[in-house]
């Protein structure tokens, strides 16, 4: 199905179609990091994260996931707020050739049990404030490991924000 009704108001200098690259989402990050290593990839509470740092963090986390037994095609729950940790975790899961299962941080026990059972996830990357909801699942589901992220890791120590 092709949608064209917007073409009448589309800017004339922009193409109406585009060819998608034959690359993975992770490869696109890798290319950006090689081309623009010192450009800002993420800003979090006034602290910029450069593409070089983002790629290094992603590679380290992907290596950790693989060392923990995450293999190609495994499903990994991603249960945290929008943050640099989310971005790093998302790309790291992809880099490990696993499948990202994003879980809304508003979900609690019943929904979490469903996600774990439905996807067969054995590993979860969770934000610190959500650990209390996901850690009990280690005893009642097939979940084997929870990695908890601390949100203050990437905060600029000199920020004047009220944290």
Residue ranges, per PLM feature:
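Conserved AMP-binding/adenylate-forming core of the ANL superfamily
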Residues: 19, 30, 38-83, 87-91, ...
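Short, flexible loop segments at the rims of nucleotide/cofactor-binding pockets, characterized by
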Residues: 17-21, 53, 100-103
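A short, structure-level motif marking secondary-structure boundaries and short turns
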Residues: 13-16, 25, 45-47, 73-75, ...
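Structural core segment of the AMP-binding/adenylate-forming
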Residues: 67-68, 95-163
């Amino acid at each position: 199905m092709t949608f064209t009704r917007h073409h009448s108001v589309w800017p004339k200098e922009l193409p109406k179609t585009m060819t998608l690259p034959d690359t993975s989402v992770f490869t696109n990050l890798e290319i950006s990091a090689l081309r623009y290593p010192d450009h800002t990839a993420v800003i979090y509470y006034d602290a910029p994260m450069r593409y070089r740092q983002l790629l290094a963090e992603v590679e380290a986390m992907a290596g950790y996931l693989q060392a923990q037994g995450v293999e190609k095609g495994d499903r990994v729950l991603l249960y945290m707020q929008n943050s640099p940790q989310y971005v790093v975790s998302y790309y790291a899961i992809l880099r490990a050739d696993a499948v990202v299962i994003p879980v809304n941080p508003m979900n609690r026990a019943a929904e979490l049990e469903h996600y774990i059972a439905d996807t067969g996830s054995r590993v979860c990357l969770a934000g610190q404030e959500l650990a209390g909801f996901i850690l009990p699942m280690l005893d009642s589901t097939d979940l084997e490991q929870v990695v908890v992220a601390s949100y203050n890791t990437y905060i600029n120590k000199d920020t004047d924000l009220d944290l």
